[in-house]
Each structure stands twice: as structure tokens, then as C-alpha cells.
Amino acid sequence: PNPPYNDFLRGNGYNVENPWNDHANSGLSDDGERLSGWLLKNSDLPADIEEELSETPYMTQRAIDFMKEAGDQPWLCHLSYIKPHWPYIVPAPYHNMYTKDHIIPPVRSEEEKQTNHPVYGAYLKSRICQTFARDDVRERVIPAYMGLIKQIDDQLGILFNWMKQANLFDNTMIVFTSDHGDYLGDHWMGEKDLFHDQSVKVPLIIYDPRKEAKVSEGRESNQLVECIDLAPTFLDFFNIKDKPHILEGRGLKEILHSNEDPKDWRKYAISEYDYSTRQARHIIGNEPDKAQLFMIRDSRWKYIFAEGFRPMLFDLEVDPKELHDLGESQKKIHLNAKKRLYDALFEWARKHHSRTTVTNEEIEKRTGKEPP
């Protein structure tokens, strides 16, 4: 593939076949040897690229270009910064802004390391988790990861200042979020594949310029919100009627335009993951079509369903760091929580998720009538 970013870099003097790989995501040794950022041992090197030409500033400028081209017409811009992400390497001056002294201790326990849960245990045996469980790897990678985050912070400042100068800031909703988190050694894990909060509890910061949102300015809500809630939120912002037969989410205006959380908000949040391509599936010898994981949580409990294996359960009130798996507990309170959450997950799974062409109103009109 030849993405536009490679053309951009070649146009700025990086005349190699793949400057994204060889410059934006590689460093140099003291003797000039090119060292790949895909290798974690090179994460402390500065990427061999001018900072203003690296990926994150490039994406900021593309967003600005998009807004300029849109002019006065309504628009929606999905500015998807790829970083922080593999390869974990960042250009100067961000590569050495942070050191191992800035790293907080990992959230993990010996009890977790000795887990008898087949899927979790298989992950802990996988190469990526074995790697990120090492302190020397964390001490090399996390400072670069923090540098990548700091670069995004700075670029958002540049973007917002431009929007203010262009008179866009006061009529544009801004949502800052992510698709997932990263374990970085917490729970002896790497990457994103299970359902601890390090992976699934992502930031969600919303700036709503409408006067009705002033009442919630600076407020933090503890309601269970899912990424699928964003699409109906955007439709509402543009005064477009929601299509609940297509979109499963619930718009967030009730939260944004009130100083109190709604009383009838959802009771559960759900996440799902297919680990069929991950090394863990091979370790436990599972079939691809059985490699499904589901998570359902409420305000206190988190329940993880692994097809073919026992569940996991965490009491977030007593154990907010999720260090003690209660999936095998026979205590009544735990049995009740497991049954209730399993039943709620099964109810969700039985819902009709595929009828996306006809509204409920149209269904009512057609009910009991012979087809034409």
C-alpha cells in the first residue's frame, strides 16, 4: 500500500520506498544504523523524522484542511490519531520528556499470575503478555507511550486554537475518546484483549457548545456509557431524528444538558471480543468459532463470559483494581450476581439486532395486513 502520508513524506525529502516505516517509525543507532520502532528495545530512541512532519501533526493538519474545505456547510470530522500505538516510538523532543521515574507501579497480583482460568491463563503465557510483564520492557516503552500522549495534547491545543481563530469553536461539539486502552503490564497483560478497566474504560470527554449544556460544564458522570451512544448523540446535535431500529446506542443529551444523571439510564454496559486470531486460542486448543468473550457490568459487578469455560466475576466495590476473580465462588452474593448478569447478557443476545431497514412504526402499520 502507498498511503497519502508516504507521499507527503517523500514530498518533504524522505525519499525512500516506505518513509512511514523507515523514518516516522524508526530510530538511528549512534553509528547511523536504522533501528525499527516495532522492536520494543528501540522505544527510547527518537524517531528519525522532524516532529512537525510526524504522524500526529500530520493528522492535525489534515483535520484543519478538512474544516477549511467544508466551509459553512455542516460537517462531522473523525480525527483518528493512530498514536499512542505500535510502533512505540516518538520523535524528539517527546522521546525523553519522561523517564522510568514517571511510571506508576503496575496493577497486578500474584493471585492473578496463578489463575486457573483457561483463557486468562493462556493470555499470560502468550508472547506479548510475557513481554509486557517484564519491568525492563515497561521502563523502556511507557516513557515513549507518555511522550506520544503528550504530543497529542500539544496537537489538540494547536487544533483548538485554530478553531477559535476560525470562529468554529463555539458551534462545534468536540468528543475525545478512544477505541480501547492498553494494559502495558497491568494484570500481567499487554495490548488490549481482555476486559479489565485498563482496556475497556476509555476516556470520554465531551465539549457541547449549546447553551443548554452549560449546566453540566465540568461535571463528571458515572453513568454506564458505550461507544455506540455517540452516533445518536451526533444526530441529535444536527437535529436529525434518531433511527433506533438501526442504531442501538442512546444519545447523551440527557446527561449533557442536566446537572443530574437521568434516573432511567441503562443498567448494564456490554463489550465483546473475538480472540480467534490471538496466540491464546492456540495455547488452549480452542476452535476459531468458539473463541468469543463477552463482558457485562453494572454499577458494582463485572461478569466475563468465555464460551466453553467458566465465567470470571469481579466486585468493583470491594476490589476496584480487579485483582480477585470470584468466578468460582459459591457464596450466595456471588452466585446471585453471576446468575443475574448472565441472564442480562442472554437477554441482550436475544434482541433483534439485524432488522435495520424498517422502523417499529412501519412494522405497526403493516401488522395484520396481507402483503400487497
Identify the function of each model-found stretch:
Residues 8, 12-224, 237-246, 333-336, ...:
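Active-site-proximal cap/lid insertion segments
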Residues 76-79, 98, 204-205, 234, ...:
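A short aromatic-rich beta-strand->coil structural motif
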Residues 106-107, 215-219, 243-246, 265-268, ...:
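Short, hydrophobic secondary-structure boundary micro-motifs
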Residues 126-140, 148, 307, 326-372:
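Long, internal low-complexity/basic segments
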Residues 62, 201, 226-237, 251, ...:
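Generic recognition of well-ordered alpha-helical segments
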Residues 1:
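His/Cys-centered metal/cofactor-coordination and adjacent catalytic loops
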Residues 180-186, 212, 228-231, 236-312, ...:
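C-terminal cap/loop subdomain of S1 sulfatases and analogous C-terminal strand-loop tails that border
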